[in-house]
Amino acid sequence: KTMKNEHLENLVVGEEHWTKKGDVDLFMWNKFLPSDEVKNGTILFVHGSSMASQPTFDLEVKGRPFSSAMNYFAALGYDTWCVDMEGYGRSSKHRDITCDIANGADDLAAATAYIKQYSGCTGIHLYGISSGALRAAVFTEQYPERLGRLALDAFVWTGEGSPTLIERRKKLPEFSKSKRRPINYAFVQSIFNRDHPDCVEPKVIDAFAQAICSLDDSMPNGTYIDMCSRLPVVDPEKITVPTIILRGQYDGIASVTDLLKFFEKTNESSIIKTKILDALGGKKYWWSKLRSFVYEEKHVFHHCRSGGAVLGGWFFNRSSYPTVG
């Protein structure tokens, strides 16, 4: 199905930014429509354990419009940002550390401070996927005043019922012996066969793998070590901003049981709503569905039966937004 504002993707502008965290240089990427139209807000996207930010959130796939989450939300009037965590992509890799979840939360502190100073925005919306969701949640506990809304995709709390983490823990001694682990094209392909095959178009996997491997041939071990041995790292009672949790049917890291227990411990004044979305027609449909998230609800759980971890997030100002079919 053709999106009604597909023509806007070609108008989206990208700009490179850099900020400091001590002696660490953090690469940031900003995409937006260069117009005077009303902006719906600012979104910062947070990547996971095995890929930098641009391959994750600004992917280009020939003949496939809006493969970039940043382009999609920029076309909707959002000011979109992503940041390479320390040890990933274009950001500094010189320190002899594992770049764990807590370190990633520090990266987000530096990134959000820069965005607020640069653009003057208030209430940055934050989207994190997998270990990026953990980084985002830890940061939210520390700096709730900087945020508008929070989206946690492929999130895990205690790790209960996670077949992926059960298998990954078998390699914990290996991960603990080194600061980084090698990755290559075949490794990236294996990510899409881990939970359930055939959930993603082959040309998307190819473009994704090539983009990741063009920036990195190894990844930090810190988030793997944390997810295998140090969960939980987030206290749900300290998440006080409006939050949506996204989970794909075949997500091998985040079990429904684990996530619902997390929800049970959220703020008592929160409105909790569970939706089961069946047979979703791919990422564009999923992103547009997220726009219908009721503005007043504080915490919402979505379970998607059509795929693994879903790329995208949604933060909605109901007063004004372009139409997407």
Explain the meaning of each model-derived region:
Residues 4-37:
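N-terminal cap/lid segment of alpha/beta-hydrolase-fold proteins
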Residues 35-78:
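Short, surface-exposed "cap/lid" segments of acyl-processing enzymes
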Residues 54-55, 81-99:
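Glycine-rich "HGGG/HGxG" loop immediately N-terminal to the catalytic nucleophile
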Residues 105-123:
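Conserved acidic catalytic loop of the alpha/beta-hydrolase fold
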Residues 122-127, 131-159:
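Conserved hydrolase catalytic core segment
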Residues 165-246:
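Alpha/beta-hydrolase
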Residues 252-258:
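Conserved alpha/beta-hydrolase "acid-adjacent" motif
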